[in-house]
Amino acid sequence: MVQENKNFATAKAKSIRVSPRKLNLVAAFIRNMKVSEALVQLTFSPKRISKVVKACLQSAVANAENNLGLDIDRLVITNATVGKALVMKRVMPRAKGRATRINKFFSNLYITVTEKEDN
């Protein structure tokens, strides 16, 4: 797939120590938002994972500015995708010699920012 007019930049954060379900709450919140507004929302968000999402978004903005020369004031988050990464399996001792398995989930985050056209 070859694109002639590349006016979008991407950034990814892999193996984030949070479940995809929790990460998707924050990713869905910032989807289709202007970058400046999303950065403010992520700064004051009470969610623990919002700091990692903010760092990934700042990386996407830096990629757009430095690699493609896009105007950062017109950037919009067009895609914020959450994927499943590895699952660490741990054992928790229980009563009467039993044990249960604990799953520690990891996630991947992909953010795409696009320069919005002025009409």
From Swiss-Prot:
The record's GO molecular-function terms, alphabetically, read: rRNA binding; structural constituent of ribosome
GO biological processes: translation
Q: Which Gene3D superfamilies match?
A: Ribosomal protein L22/L17
Report if keyword Ribonucleoprotein is assigned: yes
Give the residue range of the signal peptide: none
What's any one GO cellular component for it? cytosolic large ribosomal subunit
UniProt keyword annotations, A-Z: Ribonucleoprotein, Ribosomal protein, RNA-binding, rRNA-binding
Disulphide bridges: none
What the record says about family reads:
Belongs to the universal ribosomal protein uL22 family.
The protein's matches in PANTHER family, at most eight in alphabetical order, are given as: CHLOROPLAST 50S RIBOSOMAL PROTEIN L22-RELATED (PTHR13501), LARGE RIBOSOMAL SUBUNIT PROTEIN UL22M (PTHR13501:SF8)
In UniProt terms, what function does this protein have? This protein binds specifically to 23S rRNA; its binding is stimulated by other ribosomal proteins, e.g. L4, L17, and L20. It is important during the early stages of 50S assembly. It makes multiple contacts with different domains of the 23S rRNA in the assembled 50S subunit and ribosome.
Assembly with partners or alone: Part of the 50S ribosomal subunit.
UniProt-recorded name of the protein: Large ribosomal subunit protein uL22
Per the UniProt record, the source organism is: Rickettsia bellii (strain OSU 85-389)
* Gene designation: rplV
